[in-house]
Amino acid sequence: MLDPKYLRSEIDEAAARLATRGYVLDVAAVNALEEKRKDLQSRTQELQAERNARSKSIGEAARRGEDVAPLKAEVTKINDELETSKIELDALLTEIKSISDAIPNLPSETTPVGRDENDNVEVRRWGTPRQFTFPVRDHIDLGEAAKGVDFKNGVKLSGARFVVMKGQIARLHRALAQFMLDLHTLQHGYTECYVPYLVNPDSLYGTGQLPKFSQDLFNTGIEGEGEDEGKMRKFSLIPTSEVPLTNMARDEIFDEQELPIKMTAHSPCFRSEAGSYGRDTRGLIRMHQFDKVEMVQLVHPEKSWEALEEMAGHAEKVLQLLELPYRVMALATGDMGFCAAKTYDLEVWLPAQNTYREISSVSNCTDFQARRMQARVRIDGKPQLLHTLNGSGLAVGRTLVAVIENYQQEDGRIAIPAALQSYMGGLTHIG
C-alpha cells in the first residue's frame, strides 16, 4: 500500500510514475473522493461536538429544574444525523481503501521504463552455454528415460500440471533443496524456518496477494474451534513461503539493532496459474505445485537497496556453484510484480529450449508490504515502517530442469554437479 499522505499531496507525480507500470490512476476520481472524505469527516466531527455540548446542557438544565424534553429531542435528532454521517463516512473510507489496495508499488528511479518483458534490461551474465556434440534432449525425455519423472500418474492423481517424481530424480530434487538451504544458512546468514502451508486472509493481504490476485490462489476452509466454533475459518495454500515468512513481522515493532532479519524456507508452492492457459503445458516449468527455497529480508529503510544487490548475489551463488549459465535481468516497470519497486530476474540457460528461462525473482518491496502489515522498526525512539525484500533462492523444480538438461550425456545419463554429489551419497551419474 502506498503512503496515503503521499497520494494526497503528490497525486499527479504518483499517477505519472504508476503510468510507467501500465496502471492508470484516475486522479479526478481520487481527488473527488478525498474532498468528499474531508467534508464528511468534518461534518461528523461537528455533529459529535454539537451532541456533546447539547448533552452537557441537558444536565445543566436539569439541575436548574428546567424542562429538558426539547433538549433531549434535539440530541436525539443530532444522534440520528451523526449515525447517518458515520455510516456514509465508513462506506466512503471502505471505497477509498478498496481503490488504495489495488494500486501497485511505485517503481524505483533505477527501474527500466517499459511495457512488458520485451523491455527488460540485461544487467550481466555468467557462464557459457555448453556446446553439445549430439542431439539435445529435453528434461521430459531424459527424466522419463531415467524412470524418475512420471506425468501419467500426476495426471491420474490430480490432473494437468502435476507430476510424480521417483527414484534418483526425486533424490536429486531433494538434494537441490538441501544444498540451497545449507548455502543460505551456513554462508549467507539466513535463519531456516519451517512455515505453515495454509495461511489466513490477513497474511495474504499483508504481502499483496489479496484482494487483487485471489484468482491465483487455492482456497479452503475448516470448522472453527474454541471461540470460532460454528464459524468457517478461511485458508489458502501458500503461493510462496514469502507469505508466511514476511508476515511474521506483521504488527511487530523491532529494535533497530535487530535488523536485518534474514529468513529462508523450503516449501511447496501452490498456484492456479490463472491466465497461463496454453503456456508451458509440457514438463516441469509451470506447475500447480512446485518447491521453492525462499529468501526474505526485513531491513532498515535506508539499507534496502544494498540488501537487494546482496540478495541477488545470494541467488546467483547457487547457480554459480552448480555451474549453470545464467543472466540477470532488470525487469521493466510494466513487467514487475504488484509489490515490487525494483526486481531482478535470474534466467538460467535451458539447452532444449535454446534460451534463458526465469529461475528466480528478487525484489525490493520498500515499505509497500510493511504498510499493509504495520511492520515497523524503532529508529531514534520513533516507530517507522521497515522495508521488505524477497527472492527465490531458487525454484527447485526449474533448477532440476536446468541440471538435467545442462548435464545430460550422449548415452542418456545425467551427470551430477560436483556441488551436489555429497548430497547424493557420492553418486556421479543418474541413468
UniProtKB/Swiss-Prot annotation:
Pfam families the record matches: Seryl_tRNA_N, tRNA-synt_2b
InterPro entries for this protein: aa-tRNA-synt_IIb, aa-tRNA-synth_II, aa-tRNA-synth_II/BPL/LPL, Ser-tRNA-ligase_type_1, Ser-tRNA-synth_1_N, SerRS_1_N_sf, SerRS_core, tRNA-bd_arm
EC number: 6.1.1.11
Family: Belongs to the class-II aminoacyl-tRNA synthetase family. Type-1 seryl-tRNA synthetase subfamily.
Quaternary organization: Homodimer. The tRNA molecule binds across the dimer.
Lineage, highest ranks first: Bacteria, Pseudomonadati, Pseudomonadota, Gammaproteobacteria, Aeromonadales
Designated name of the protein: Serine--tRNA ligase
Domains: entry comment: Consists of two distinct domains, a catalytic core and a N-terminal extension that is involved in tRNA binding.
PANTHER family per UniProt: SERINE--TRNA LIGASE, SERYL-TRNA SYNTHETASE
An example Gene Ontology biological process: seryl-tRNA aminoacylation
